[in-house]
């Protein structure tokens, strides 16, 4: 008898709380779970359980972050909250928490602070499509302070506009008072989630995107031809589909003449599946690990790009010393290392362990590259940093 399939009745969306330290990100996360738990859409998580974050590893970097889940009438959400500022930077740059939208928490008593700005900039660099603002701690201001609130809102709108976030909605409330059950502030949490439902776009499913599979291994089957194996990153491939092999050399056209998974023949392979693809007209020497099989014309090979990186501290297993322009590490993309030369921005003399900085990179060989793609920086096989491609130059 066939196994039952898991029914996804609602679209799934990933969100996260961002903002300056002590502006109430974790308290808001707790308040959302409490208010939605009362409506039957979540399990209440108190502040302490969210704040006590487990360590996780992403691309060799240790990150502390808490994941909670909840449902509104319209959607199922996975929500990430990070305790420390460095954890946010690492989380966003390594893509440990891919966000479809962010809830920016700003204390009305402070307004926009340095980390508020930095998190908005990071969200933009990481292509987070939408930001909804929760103006927290409004209960600490008197009724006469409504002009101050208007000023804070104006400043936030200007800041968000300058980073390309137009018409970001702002909801006023108090996460702490909502946690305490004050009806007025519970209502502001309900309003916030209604706005998040509307303002954060539903992400396109991975299977709806054009096909891409990074090659992990290659072997020949006598009498059949050459097989490339790997995990399908996105999209769908069917037998007899035309494909392109790109990266590390010249682009080659081919056709998928057969598909296998666990020695079973497939009609099609979908995002997330580990498969072998039999390729027409290619020999084993034409293909190597690190190349990508893609739907024709959907992805191109490049060697030069810009992007933000986070450099690990010594304690995190990173370098003990700074590096300078002209530094030549390995850059690990998808399934392979490629040597690249790093140039620092004008006015930046060196990068210390623990810094995050925007770098320009020239690779010695082209790879299938796209905006938003993640990479690790490695030295002698260990990860010493991680980054994201924010702009392709060549």
UniProtKB/Swiss-Prot annotation:
Q: What is its EC number?
A: 3.6.5.3
Region (G2) spans which residues?
60-64
Q: Where does GTP bind?
A: 19-26, 81-85, 136-139
Segments of this protein annotated with the region G5? 174-176
**Domain of life here?**
Bacteria
Instruction: Cite the residue spans of the region called G1.
Output: 19-26
Identify the Gene3D superfamilies for this entry. P-loop containing nucleotide triphosphate hydrolases, Translation factors
Q: Where is the tr-type G domain?
A: 10-204
> Keyword Ion transport, does the record have it?
no
For region G3, the annotated ranges are 81-84
Alphabetic keyword roster = Cytoplasm, Elongation factor, GTP-binding, Hydrolase, Magnesium, Metal-binding, Nucleotide-binding, Protein biosynthesis
Kindly list the positions annotated as binding Mg(2+). 26
Catalytic activity annotation? GTP + H2O = GDP + phosphate + H(+)
Where is the segment annotated G4? 136-139
- Whom does it interact with, and what assembly results? Monomer.
Similarity section: Belongs to the TRAFAC class translation factor GTPase superfamily. Classic translation factor GTPase family. EF-Tu/EF-1A subfamily.
* Protein name per the record: Elongation factor Tu
**Organism, as annotated:** Protochlamydia amoebophila (strain UWE25)
Lineage, top ranks: Bacteria, Pseudomonadati, Chlamydiota, Chlamydiia, Parachlamydiales
């Amino acid at each position: 008898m066939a196994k039952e399939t898991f029914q996804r009745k609602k679209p799934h969306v990933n969100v996260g709380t961002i903002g300056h330290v002590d502006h109430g990100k974790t308290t808001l996360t707790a308040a959302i779970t409490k208010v939605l738990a009362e409506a039957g859409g979540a399990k209440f998580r108190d502040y302490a359980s969210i704040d006590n974050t487990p360590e996780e590893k992403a691309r060799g970097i240790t990150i502390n972050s808490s994941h909670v889940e909840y449902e509104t009438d319209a959607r199922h959400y996975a929500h990430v909250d990070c305790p420390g500022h460095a954890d946010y930077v690492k989380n966003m740059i390594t893509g440990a928490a891919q966000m479809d939208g962010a809830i920016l928490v700003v204390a009305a008593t402070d307004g926009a602070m340095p980390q508020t700005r930095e998190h908005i900039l990071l969200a933009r660099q990481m292509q987070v499509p939408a930001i909804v603002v929760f103006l927290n701690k409004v209960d600490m201001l008197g009724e006469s302070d409504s002009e101050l609130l208007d000023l804070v809102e104006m400043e936030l709108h200007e800041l968000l506009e300058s980073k390309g976030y137009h018409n970001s909605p702002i909801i006023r409330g108090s996460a702490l008072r909502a946690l305490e059950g004050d009806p007025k502030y519970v209502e502001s949490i309900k309003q916030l989630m209604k706005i998040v439902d509307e303002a954060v776009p539903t992400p396109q499913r991975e299977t709806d995107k054009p096909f891409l599979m990074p090659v992990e291994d290659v072997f020949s089957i006598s009498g059949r031809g050459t097989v490339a194996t790997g995990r399908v990153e996105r999209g769908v491939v069917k037998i007899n589909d035309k494909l392109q092999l790109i990266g590390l050399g010249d682009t080659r056209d081919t056709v998928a003449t057969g598909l296998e998974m666990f020695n079973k023949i497939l009609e099609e392979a979908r995002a997330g599946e580990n498969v072998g693809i039999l390729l027409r007209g290619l020999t084993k020497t034409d293909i190597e690990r690190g190349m990508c099989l893609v739907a024709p014309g959907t992805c191109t090979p490049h060697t030069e790009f810009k992007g933000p990186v986070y450099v690990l501290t010594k304690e995190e297993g990173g370098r003990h010393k700074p590096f300078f322009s002209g530094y030549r590490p390995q850059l690990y993309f998808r399934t392979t290392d490629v040597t690249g030369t790093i140039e620092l921005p004008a006015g930046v003399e060196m990068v210390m362990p623990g810094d995050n900085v925007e770098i320009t990179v020239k690779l010695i060989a082209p790879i299938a590259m796209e905006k938003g793609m993640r990479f690790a920086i490695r030295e002698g096989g260990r990860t010493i940093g991680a980054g994201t491609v924010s702009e392709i130059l060549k």
